[in-house]
Each structure stands twice: as C-alpha cells, then as structure tokens.
C-alpha cells in the first residue's frame, strides 16, 4: 500500500555515498521521466476506485535530483578519473543544480482535479538545496507548504566531519545551514513539521568518541534525541565495504579504525 499510489520520477543517483550501492544498481546518471508521462500517471490514479486523492510519494532514489544533470556526463559519460559529481566538500562545477523543473512538476500534479495531496516521501539531498542559489529556497518552500506529511527525510548519517569524509557525505555545516532554512520556512508557514534523520553507527573510521560527539550534536544543535541508528553493514561493491575488509582508506591507503568486535 505504501507504493501503490506513488510515482517514480527518475532513476539513478550521483550522490555516491561510499556505503550505498544505488549507483551500481541504477547508474550514476539521472534518467528523468518526461513531465507529460508523470502527469499522465497521476491522472490515471484519479480513475481508480481505491484512490483517495493522496499520492504517497513523488520521487526516486533521491527525490530532488529530478530534472537536471551534468551536461558533460550526458554527452561523454561519467568521468573516468576518481572524480565525483558530489563529494564530501563541494559539487563539481559542471553540475548545474536546478530545482525549477521539479518545482513546476509538483505544481502541475497539485493542479490535477482529484489530487488532494502529493507527498514527497523519498529522501532529499539537502546539500543540493543549499547549493541551488536560484531555486533551492523556492523548492524547499514548496515542499514545506504542500508536500511534507509532518516530517521530511534527510540522511546526514553522522555529524563528525572526519567520519562524514569516509562516508562520502557533506560536512555538518551544510546540515546546520539547511536546518536553519527549514525551520524558518516552517515558522513562516505556521506549521509544526520536523526533520527525520538517518544515522549510521560504526561506519569504518567511526570510533566510540565520534558517537558521543554525534549524541551531543543531535541534542544541542538538532534539538532532538535519536530513537534509532543503523549499525553499518558492509554492502558488496561499495567503497565502505572495502574499508571494512581492509581497514584502509582506499583513496589514501591510510589505516583507519574499523569496529568488528562489538
């Protein structure tokens, strides 16, 4: 039932978190469905007897990667050297982040007669929102005003910058900046909506002291008490699995701590 009335807008992910295998399964290039095709599916829902007017999700592996790609990658393929579209510190300069198509798509779905709500339940990359200086704020406002069912899913995974580097995730300051933007928009809208954080414990490079740091950060900066965290599980075909097995950073060949005993 969760996915019965949901819409997949695209496939692929160029986030390349070191622990994630989505890029291996679906590719590093975003394959975006046309707006017309997506709207046709949304209109079809309204003809179904069991449809109550609620689309449970409009998204993909990363909801806000819809509608834009690196022009260089689309014509020449992914970079062959060890270069990422999004790394732990910045976006590649040829990746022009643009949420405008996504914004218009969500507006068009809302305008369909018989559609009461269209939620975006898939996770979003908050670093893409903060990087889009032209449309990022507008996209988040659109989400806050119309497309969040009480909570928005984001995946910082950790808050220690050293651990985040090993994960291939953006630094904690990006999360702080995003949360400030999110809180501001919710206050302006008069809504009480929250952020749900995906967190990972015991990733290669993560020591007990880092988990204490995480607890302090979530309490004092995020103003919440995590109820759960996923214990790292090495997934075949990922850099994090290489780190787990070799106890080395595959990019620097430096020794890293790997929790295996407890």
Residue ranges of each PLM-predicted region?
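N-terminal pre-triad scaffold of radical SAM enzymes
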Residues: 1-21, 39, 46, 52-57
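Conserved, mostly hydrophobic/aromatic
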Residues: 13, 38, 154, 229
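Iron-sulfur (Fe-S) cluster-binding segments and ferredoxin-like electron-carrier domains
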Residues: 20-37
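Conserved SAM/AdoMet-binding glycine-rich loop
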Residues: 44-196, 200-204
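Structural recognition of alpha->loop->beta junctions
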Residues: 138-151, 215-236
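Eukaryotic scaffolding regions of large macromolecular assemblies
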Residues: 185-192, 214-215, 243-245
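Catalytic cores of alpha/beta
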Residues: 203-220
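C-terminal accessory regions of radical SAM enzymes
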Residues: 209, 223-226, 231-262
């Amino acid at each position: 039932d969760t996915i019965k009335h949901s819409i997949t807008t695209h496939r692929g992910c160029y986030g390349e978190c070191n622990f994630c295998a989505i890029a291996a399964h679906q590719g590093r290039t975003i394959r975006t469905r046309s707006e017309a095709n997506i709207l046709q599916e949304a209109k079809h829902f309204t003809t179904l007897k069991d449809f109550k007017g609620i689309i449970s999700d409009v998204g993909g592996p990363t909801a806000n990667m819809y509608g834009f790609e690196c022009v260089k990658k689309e014509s020449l393929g992914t970079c062959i050297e060890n270069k990422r579209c999004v790394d732990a510190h910045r976006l590649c300069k040829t990746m022009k982040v643009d949420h405008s198509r996504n914004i218009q798509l969500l507006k068009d779905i809302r305008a369909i007669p018989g559609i009461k709500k269209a939620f975006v339940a898939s996770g979003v990359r908050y670093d893409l929102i903060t990087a889009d200086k032209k449309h990022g704020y507008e996209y988040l406002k659109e989400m806050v005003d119309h497309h969040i069912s009480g909570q928005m899913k984001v995946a910082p995974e950790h808050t220690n910058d050293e651990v985040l580097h090993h994960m291939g995730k953006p630094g904690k300051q990006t999360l702080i900046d995003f949360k400030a933007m999110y809180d501001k928009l919710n206050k302006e809208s008069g809504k009480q909506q929250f952020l749900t954080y995906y967190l990972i414990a015991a990733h290669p490079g993560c020591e007990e002291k880092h988990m204490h740091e995480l607890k302090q950060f979530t309490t004092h900066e995020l103003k919440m008490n995590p109820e759960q965290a996923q214990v790292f599980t090495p997934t075949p075909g990922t850099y994090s699995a290489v780190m787990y097995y070799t106890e080395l950073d595959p990019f620097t060949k430096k020794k890293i701590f790997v929790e295996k005993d407890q």
